């Protein structure tokens, strides 16, 4: 685990701790990617993660280490479709903690679509890209941020759930030689 999990000395009495006899986290990843370049530049992937001795902060902001492994599976894909100067890029991810799901809250589904127009301008001296991105992820009780620890802690019983609604952003970016301009309106919906 990182040093922040091992020991903390604070003026706030509730934030003084020392994690006794910690074990090293062991992360094992098995997975692969299949690319189908002929079909809209598409790729699919599958990943499986096994994390032994997973270290986390509980809802009381105290470091803990899991006695059993945390197993996570992910299946997803990405595809890009081009038609003239219009581009459509979509990405999906299905993920699930197979056990100890309360130790690492996460959305079961994450999706993103990016529709943009890309062209050259000013006698081909500039590249311009303008578009809209839409994100969505399923509702889940997210971990809470502790500014005293500068870490995320497990959600409390009264935790606020996030997700379950789309988020849309609009943007325009331009590159002229070595200079980049980027303007984005986030969460316009």
Task: Name each model feature, range by range.
Residues 1-189:
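Exposed, low-structure sequence patches enriched in small/polar residues
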């Amino acid at each position: 685990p990182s040093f922040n999990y091992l020991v903390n000395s604070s003026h706030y009495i509730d934030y003084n701790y020392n994690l006794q006899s910690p074990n090293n986290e062991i992360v094992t990843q098995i997975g692969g990617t299949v690319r189908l370049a002929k079909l809209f530049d598409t790729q699919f992937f599958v990943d499986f993660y096994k994390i032994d001795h997973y270290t986390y902060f509980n809802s009381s902001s105290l470091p803990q280490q899991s006695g059993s492994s945390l197993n996570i599976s992910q299946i997803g894909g990405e595809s890009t479709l081009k038609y003239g100067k219009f581009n459509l890029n979509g990405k999906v991810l299905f993920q699930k903690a197979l056990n100890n799901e309360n130790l690492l809250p996460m959305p079961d589904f994450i999706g993103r679509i990016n529709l943009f127009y890309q062209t050259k301008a000013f006698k081909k001296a500039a590249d311009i890209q303008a578009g809209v991105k839409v994100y969505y992820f399923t509702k889940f009780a997210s971990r809470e941020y502790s500014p005293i620890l500068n870490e995320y802690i497990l959600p409390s019983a009264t935790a606020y759930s996030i997700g379950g609604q789309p988020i849309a952003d609009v943007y325009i970016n331009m590159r002229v030689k070595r200079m980049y301009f980027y303007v984005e309106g986030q969460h316009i919906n």
